[in-house]
């Protein structure tokens, strides 16, 4: 692994089930994540994904690439355009920094972007530790 290495893109179909299940699993009962009418009343065209679901998808993207022994040490994300049902979010990432980690592991800083039909849904960085 080297700085500049790109992770392969991951396309995530944004379904109503994913949005609602992610909200319920993270105990986020805000109506905008499960009630389309309430979301419309608050100015959104439909329900939208919460940050905890996005955070989980970003973590999955990184660990799927680096393997089951990879450990996420820090996830720092910022949301932008909402993820609505029927869209697709494409996650992309680039290794920005690589350093020696504890006990012979390698620590990498990965820059992440998740884009959908409206623009950038998520941007941020993930620090991941990978055994050699």
Which stretches of residues belong to each language-model region?
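Hydrophobic residues in beta-strands and at strand termini
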Residues: 14, 79, 128-130
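Hydrophobic residues on conserved beta-strands that form the core of alpha/beta folds
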Residues: 9, 72-74, 123
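HotDog/MaoC-like acyl-thioester-processing domains
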Residues: 1-7, 85-132
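N-terminal hydrophobic or amphipathic segments with adjacent small-residue motifs
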Residues: 37, 45, 50-53, 80, ...
């Amino acid at each position: 692994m080297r700085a500049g290495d790109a992770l392969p893109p991951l396309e995530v179909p944004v379904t109503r089930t994913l949005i609602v299940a992610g909200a319920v699993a993270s105990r986020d009962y805000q109506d905008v994540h499960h009630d389309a009418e309430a979301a419309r009343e608050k100015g959104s065209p439909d329900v939208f994904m919460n940050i905890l679901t996005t955070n989980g998808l970003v973590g999955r993207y990184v660990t799927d690439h680096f393997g089951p022994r990879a450990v996420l040490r820090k996830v720092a994300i910022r949301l932008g355009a909402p993820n609505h049902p029927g869209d697709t979010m494409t996650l992309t990432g680039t290794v920005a920094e690589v350093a020696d980690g504890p006990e012979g592991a390698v620590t990498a800083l990965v820059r992440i972007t998740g884009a959908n039909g409206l623009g950038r849904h998520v941007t941020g960085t993930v620090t991941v530790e990978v055994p050699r």
